[in-house]
Amino acid sequence: MTNSIKSGKPEIFDTINNKTIADTLAAPFAGKITFEYVKEYVDDIINVSEDEMIESLRMMIERLKIVPEPSASACFVPIVFNKLNLSSKSKCLVVVCGGNIDLKRIKSLF
């Protein structure tokens, strides 16, 4: 989506990184409808690394006692790694799902 926003149009990629833990976020294209919503309603896009997602996932499991799907850990990364400009009085909501959990795959990360 970052590349699509930069170019001003939905982009299609010939190849994608299929070695990511966030496989549900690794679409080879930005959908037209989603692109229009992002263009209109999203103020900023924060890119995250594989290592940050793995660490975020570990923290969610160990500290919050929840087991999200790996892609959901991407939502928690900006908070864990201070990538947001939040004051101590800020309120933040992170929506987390677990519909695509592969416990063997998660176990292999740690």
Where are these regions (language model features)?
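Glycine-rich phosphate/pyrophosphate-binding loop at beta-loop-alpha junctions
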Residues: M1-E40, S88-F110
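Active-site-adjacent helical/loop segments in soluble small-molecule enzymes
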Residues: G31-K89
